């Protein structure tokens, strides 16, 4: 009996010693910041996570990854930093701060932040068969200090003002405002992303008069709330082209009618023919005007059909204004050609019938 009791005591002591020397995996949780961490483009950002209850994580596997577990941003395993499995673009830009690893706290530092770094990061701890993770989120922000306002030459439709700004992240809010701070609906708005995924913004506004006073191009970063704006004052003289074009067209039409109808009236009186005669100068003058109108309309339709641009295209507004200007030029050119043809025809006809 004494021998059996002594053997049991020795077994109990050995088992206790083994439990003391062999570390056991305990349950734990991982805590991280609940709110997103803001990171300025080109700066540095730090993401921390902590074991709970606090305990040493030196012997654990610590893995930071984005959306794929097998493609870590940073990997710490068996007391070493392993760069072989790390995504190549993070190898030179990440560092794991382990000053408090004895308490279960580590910090991932990302250098030279780019727009690609925006999003979620998984902080993963593994101890034997026990593992837990927490998710941290990075919000990358970039604000451009350069805003350009361009004024295109006025045409019959009005004055086109365009605002451009490059280098924003994420996509900013963009709008036109008048001198009273009221929002002016834009004629068009578009954006694109460059190779660094930064947003290039473009917005246009077609003005028919100067009732808005000075106008402001306003941009706002939705994450930081930072605002940038540029204003411009438009002179009333820029909006006088509409009436000028109308006067020019009216004058040209009046001259056209004069040059066509006067010779035809003279010939009508000279020949004393009825207006219903197919060869009468009156009908010929009307025929020249009608033919010219058909040619002008045909050229206008052809011009617009061959240069059509989808409404969604960034150049739609500019192309539309270009087509309108070309249409006016075609009308003016055809009016002069018609005047010349009519003048030559009636003069020659009158000359040969003297």
UniProtKB/Swiss-Prot annotation:
Protein origin, superkingdom: Eukaryota
Key word Calcium present: no
InterPro entries noted in UniProt: BTN3A2-like_Ig-C, Ig-like_dom, Ig-like_dom_sf, Ig-like_fold, Ig_sub, Ig_V-set, IgSF_BTN/MOG
Membrane-related topology note: Multi-pass membrane protein
A single GO BP: regulation of cytokine production
GO MF annotations in UniProt: signaling receptor binding
Domain Ig-like C1-type: 161-233
Subcellular locations according to the entry: Membrane
SUPFAM superfamilies xref list: Immunoglobulin
Transmembrane regions: 243-263, 283-303, 326-346
DNA-binding keyword on record: no
Tissues expressed in: Expressed in the thymus and skin.
Biological function: May act by engaging a cell surface molecule on immature T-cells in the embryonic thymus.
Note: All hominoid species have a common inactivating mutation, but that Old World monkeys such as olive baboons, green monkeys, cynomolgus macaques and rhesus macaques have apparently functional SKINT1L sequences, indicating that SKINT1L is inactivated in a common ancestor of hominoids.
The protein's name in its UniProt record: Selection and upkeep of intraepithelial T-cells protein 1
Organism, as annotated: Macaca fascicularis
Source species taxonomy: Eukaryota, Metazoa, Chordata, Craniata, Vertebrata
């Amino acid at each position: 009996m004494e021998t059996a009791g002594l053997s049991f005591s020795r077994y109990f002591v050995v088992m206790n010693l083994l439990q003391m020397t062999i570390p056991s995996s305990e349950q734990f949780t991982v805590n991280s910041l609940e709110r997103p961490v803001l990171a300025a483009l080109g700066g540095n950002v730090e993401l921390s996570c902590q074991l709970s209850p606090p305990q040493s994580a030196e012997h654990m596997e610590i893995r930071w990854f984005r959306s794929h577990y097998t493609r870590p941003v940073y990997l710490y395993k068996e007391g070493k930093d392993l760069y072989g499995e790390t995504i190549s673009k993070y190898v030179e830009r990440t560092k794991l701060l382990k000053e408090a690893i004895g308490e279960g706290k580590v910090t991932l530092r990302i250098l030279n932040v780019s727009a690609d770094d925006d999003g979620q990061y998984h902080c993963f701890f593994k101890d034997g068969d026990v593992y837990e993770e927490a998710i941290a989120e990075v919000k990358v922000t970039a604000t451009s200090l350069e805003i350009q306002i361009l004024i295109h030459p006025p045409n019959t439709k009005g004055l086109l003002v365009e605002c451009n700004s490059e280098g924003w992240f994420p996509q900013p809010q963009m709008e036109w405002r008048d001198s009273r701070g009221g929002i002016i609906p834009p004629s068009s708005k578009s954006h694109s992303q460059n190779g660094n995924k930064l947003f290039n913004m473009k917005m246009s506004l077609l003005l028919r008069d100067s009732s808005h006073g000075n106008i402001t191009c306003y941009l706002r970063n939705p994450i930081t709330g930072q605002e940038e704006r540029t204003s411009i004052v438009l002179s009333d003289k820029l909006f006088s082209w509409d009436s000028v074009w109308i006067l020019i067209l009216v004058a040209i039409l009046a001259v056209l009618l004069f040059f066509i109808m006067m010779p035809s009236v003279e010939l009508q009186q000279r020949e004393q023919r009825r207006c219903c005669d197919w060869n009468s100068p009156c009908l010929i003058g009307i025929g020249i005007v009608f033919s010219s109108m058909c040619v002008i309309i045909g050229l206008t339709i052809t011009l617009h059909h061959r240069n059509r641009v989808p409404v969604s295209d960034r150049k739609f507004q500019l192309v539309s204004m270009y087509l309108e200007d070309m249409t006016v030029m075609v009308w003016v050119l055809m009016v002069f050609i018609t005047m010349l043809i009519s003048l030559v025809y009636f003069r020659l006809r009158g000359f040969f019938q003297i």
